[in-house]
Amino acid sequence: GSITKERSWWDLNRYHLDISVKPEEKFISGSNKISYTVLKSHDLMQIDLQTPLILTKAIQDNSELEIIHDGNAHFIKLKKKQNVGSKEELIVYYEGNPRVAVRAPWDGGISWEKDKNGNHFIASSCQGLGASVWWPNKDHMYDEPESMLMSVNVPKGLTNVSNGRLVKID
């Protein structure tokens, strides 16, 4: 997508993606806490999330915000004045059955497979489509986070393998 005014006024600092994966239902739900710095005062923020996933709620400072859905772009109406230079946070919630990869990794999405022992093997391939094929974010390469925390809840017997450094297992 293009660098819209709803993307350009804020600088992405950090994500905390917190999700639950239900392999039997091919379902993902969770939230993404987005930390950002205000570059220009604006009251509309674009978050990207591809159908068939649904952005269900947005919260800032304990206040639920209105979301205007326009295809894979979701525009969040901010209530709080966005002062230039201020550091802010927003939490978006989502759920659904993400696009299934047709021919991973070239035609991406989520691959819901099983190994020879019948154990679930789930993988994302989103290089071409963008990460918004399976989680809500600012899906444009001109602005990437300085850091990201991923919290992934999987059913007993499964292990999540992700990029980065393991912090803890609950």
Write out the residue ranges for each language-model feature.
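Acidic/His-enriched low-complexity segments
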Residues: 1-170
